[in-house]
C-alpha cells in the first residue's frame, strides 16, 4: 500500500487534464502537521510558472478535475497553491483490513533486480575493530531491506586478503609452527600480526625470507598458497563468530576478497593500454583523467601498475566493478565504504565507464558514511589510545545490558536474563548507529544507546512488547482477532495513516540506503501507538466491535514494528 504513489497518480492525472505538461511533478508529500491534512501536493508552484498562470489558479483548476472520491474526506487549497488532502476514515479502515491479510504488510511486489552490496570488508590476520562497525551494520540493513522487497541480493565481503604483508605473515606463521602449535600461533590474531611486524623490523634474515615469500605467493607457489589459505580461514572463522553474534547475515559464502581479481589485473592493464586510456609514464602504467586535476591544474594521473610490476587498489577496484557487472550480472552495485575513500572510488569508476566495462545504465553507488566518535568528539578509541576490538565492544554492550535488565527484572532466571541481555545489548549498539544519518559522524555514548526512552533499541524493543501485552491481558491469540477495522477517532486515524506509510518508508530506505529513515518511522509509530493506547480504550472499549477494531490496529502495529526492526537486523522479544 503506497498512498503517496496513489495520490501522485491522481493529482498528476488532474494536472495533465488542465493542460500541464505530461511529465509534470505533482510533488505529493506526507504532511508535517495535521492541520495541513495527511498529504500535500506541492507541485503547483513550479508547473504554474511554466504555464504562465498564478499557482493558486492552477490549484483551483486541478481541484475541479481531481477525483479522490472514496479516498479523501476533504481536499483544500492552502497558501499560494498547496493542495491539502485529508484521507477518509472509511477508506483508511478498508486499507488497514487489506494490509492485515496481505503478505509482506501489503508492500507491493517489485520488478526484481540483482543488487550487489559491498560491505564489512575486514582484513586477514587482523581482528575486526570498531572501524568495521558502520559498514557491517548499515550494509546488512540495506541487504535485508532490498531482499524483503523481493530483489536478488548478492552480499560481497571484499576482504583484505592480498598484499605484500602476506610474505611477512607466512614467514611468521612458519616460525611459530616450528616453535609452537599452529592453533596457539593464531589464537590471538592481533598479537600475531604485531609480533610478525616486530620480527620483520628487527630481524633482517626474517625480512629477507618474507620478501621472498611475497614473490612466491604472487607466483602461485603451492606451499605459500597453503599457508596463506590457513591465515584466511582462521580469520574468517573468527569473523563469522562476530557476524553471528551481531545478527548480521554475512556467511563464508559471501567472501569475495581482493585475491579473487588477481588473474584479471594483467588483462585489464593491457586492455586499458590498447584502448589508449593508459600510458607508460616514468616506468609505471598510468591513466590520466581530465575529470580530476592535480595541484598544477593538469589531468590527474592514476597509477594502475607500479614500476616494479605491482598492482594497486585502484586496479583491483576496476576489476571488481567489471566482475560484478559481467559475472554477477548486477543491475545495481552499492558500496558501503567510508567517506575518505570517495575520490579513490570515483576515479576507479571513471576509468571503468571510459573503458566500457560497466554501462552508464548500471548504477555504481558509493553509500559513504561518517566516523564513529567518542564523547570527546575524537575517533572512538581505548583509554590508552588504541583501537577497540569489536568483540570487546560487544562484550561491554552485553555486560551493561545485563545490569540494566537485572535491575528491572530481579527475579528473572539466569538463562533468560542472558538471552535478553544479548538481544538488548547488541541491538543497542546496532540501532545507535542505524538511527543516525550515515553521512554524518556520530558520537558513541553508552548511556544514550541503552536508555529506555528516546529513539533507542531498548525503547523500540520495549514498545513492541507493550503492544503484545495488550493481547496477553485480553487472554487472546493476536492472530485470532476478528471483526473489521472501524476508524472513528482522530488518534485511530493518525495511527492508521502511519501504519499505511510502511511501504513508502521501506521504498525510500531501499532507494537511498538510509536506514535512519526506518528508525525515525518506527519511533514515530511507537509514539502514535502510545497516544492511541492512552486515549482509546482497547480492552475496555464501549462495545465488542470497537474493541476488535482497536485490537486490529494494535496487531498491525506489532507486525509493523517487528518487520521494520527485522529489516534493520534488530531482534525483538515477546516480553521484557
Swiss-Prot record:
Keyword line: Aminoacyl-tRNA synthetase, ATP-binding, Cytoplasm, Ligase, Nucleotide-binding, Protein biosynthesis
Signal peptide extent: none
CDD domains in UniProt: Anticodon_Ia_Arg (cd07956), ArgRS_core (cd00671)
Subcellular location: Cytoplasm
InterPro entries per UniProt: aa-tRNA-synth_I_CS (IPR001412), Arg-tRNA-ligase (IPR001278), Arg-tRNA-synth_N (IPR005148), Arg-tRNA-synth_N_sf (IPR036695), ArgRS_core (IPR035684), DALR_anticod-bd (IPR008909), Rossmann-like_a/b/a_fold (IPR014729), tRNAsynth_Ia_anticodon-bd (IPR009080)
This enzyme's EC code(s): 6.1.1.19
GO biological process, one term: arginyl-tRNA aminoacylation
Membrane-spanning parts: none
Pfam family, one: Arg_tRNA_synt_N
A GO term, aspect molecular function: ATP binding
Sequence motif 'HIGH' region, residues: 122-132
NCBIfam families according to UniProt: argS
Subunit structure: Monomer.
Name listed for the protein in its UniProt record: Arginine--tRNA ligase
Biological source species: Erwinia tasmaniensis (strain DSM 17950 / CFBP 7177 / CIP 109463 / NCPPB 4357 / Et1/99)
Amino acid at each position: 500500500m503506497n498512498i503517496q504513489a496513489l495520490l501522485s497518480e491522481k493529482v498528476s492525472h488532474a494536472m495533465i487534464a488542465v493542460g500541464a505538461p505530461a511529465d509534470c511533478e505533482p510533488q505529493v508529500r506526507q504532511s508535517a502537521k495535521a492541520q495541513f491534512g495527511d498529504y500535500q501536493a506541492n507541485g503547483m508552484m513550479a508547473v504554474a510558472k511554466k504555464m504562465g498562470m498564478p499557482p493558486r489558479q492552477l490549484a483551483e483548476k486541478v481541484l475541479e478535475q481531481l477525483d479522490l472520491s472514496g479516498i479523501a474526506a476533504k481536499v483544500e487549497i492552502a497558501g499560494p497553491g498547496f493542495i491539502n488532502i485529508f484521507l477518509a476514515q472509511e477508506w483508511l479502515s478498508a486499507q488497514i483490513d487489506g494490509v492485515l491479510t496481505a503478505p509482506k504488510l501489503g508492500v507491493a511486489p517489485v520488478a526484481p533486480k540483482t543488487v550487489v552490496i559491498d560491505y564489512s570488508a575486514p582484513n586477514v590476520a587482523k581482528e575486526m575493530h570498531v572501524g568495521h562497525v558502520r559498514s557491517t551494520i548499515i550494509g546488512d540493513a540495506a541487504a535485508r531491506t532490498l531482499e524483503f522487497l523481493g530483489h536478488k541480493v548478492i552480499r560481497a565481503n571484499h576482504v583484505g586478503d592480498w598484499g605484500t604483508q602476506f610474505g611477512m605473515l607466512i614467514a611468521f606463521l612458519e616460525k611459530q609452527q616450528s616453535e609452537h602449535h599452529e592453533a596457539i600461533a593464531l589464537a590471538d590474531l592481533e598479537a600475531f600480526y604485531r609480533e610478525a611486524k616486530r620480527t620483520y623490523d628487527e630481524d633482517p634474515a626474517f625480512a629477507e625470507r618474507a620478501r621472498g615469500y611475497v614473490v612466491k605467493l604472487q607466483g602461485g607457489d603451492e606451499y605459500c598458497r597453503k599457508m596463506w589459505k590457513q591465515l584466511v580461514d582462521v580469520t574468517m572463522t573468527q569473523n563469522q563468530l562476530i557476524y553471528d553474534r551481531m545478527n548480521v547475515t554475512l556467511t563464508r559464502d559471501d567472501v569475495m576478497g581482493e585475491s579473487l581479481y588477481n588473474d584479471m589485473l594483467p588483462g585489464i592493464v593491457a586492455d586499458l593500454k590498447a584502448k589508449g586510456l593508459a600510458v607508460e609514464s616514468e616506468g609505471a602504467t598510468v591513466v590520466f583523467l581530465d575529470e580530476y586535476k592535480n595541484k598544477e591544474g593538469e589531468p590527474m594521473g592514476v597509477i594502475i601498475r607500479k614500476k616494479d610490476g605491482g598492482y594497486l587498489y585502484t586496479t583491483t577496484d576496476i576489476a571488481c566493478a567489471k566482475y560484478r557487472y559481467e559475472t554477477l550480472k548486477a543491475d545495481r552495485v552499492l558500496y558501503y565504504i567510508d567517506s575518505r575513500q570517495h575520490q579513490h572510488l570515483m576515479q576507479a569508476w571513471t576509468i571503468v565507464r571510459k573503458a566500457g566495462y560497466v554501462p552508464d545504465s548500471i548504477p555504481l553507488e558509493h553509500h559513504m558514511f561518517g566516523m564513529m566518535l567518542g564523547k570527546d568528539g575524537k575517533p572512538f578509541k581505548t583509554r590508552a589510545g588504541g583501537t577497540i576490538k569489536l568483540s570487546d565492544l560487544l562484550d561491554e554492550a552485553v555486560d551493561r545490558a545485563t545490569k540494566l535488565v537485572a535491575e528491572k527484572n530481579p527475579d528473572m532466571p539466569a538463562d533468560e536474563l542472558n538471552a535478553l541481555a544479548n538481544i538488548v545489548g547488541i541491538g543497542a549498539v546496532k540501532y545507535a548507529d542505524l538511527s543516525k544519518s550515515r553521512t554524518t559522524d556520530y558520537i558513541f555514548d553508552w548511556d544514550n544507546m541503552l536508555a529506555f526512552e528516546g529513539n533507542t533499541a531498548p525503547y523500540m524493543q520495549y514498545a513492541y512488547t507493550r503492544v503484545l501485552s495488550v493481547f496477553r491481558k485480553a487472554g487472546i491469540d493476536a492472530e485470532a482477532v476478528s471483526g473489521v477495522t472501524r476508524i472513528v477517532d482522530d488518534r485511530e486515524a493518525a495511527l492508521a495513516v502511519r501504519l499505511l506509510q510502511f511501504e513508502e518508508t521501506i521504498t525510500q530506505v531501499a532507494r537511498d540506503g538510509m536506514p535512519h529513515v526506518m528508525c525515525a518511522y518506527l519511533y514515530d509509530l511507537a509514539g502514535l501507538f502510545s497516544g492511541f493506547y492512552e486515549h482509546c480504550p482497547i480492552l475496555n472499549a464501549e462495545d465488542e466491535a470497537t474493541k476488535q477494531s482497536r485490537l486490529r490496529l494494535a496487531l498491525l502495529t506489532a507486525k509493523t514494528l517487528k518487520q521494520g526492526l527485522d529489516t534493520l537486523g534488530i531482534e525483538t522479544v515477546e516480553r521484557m
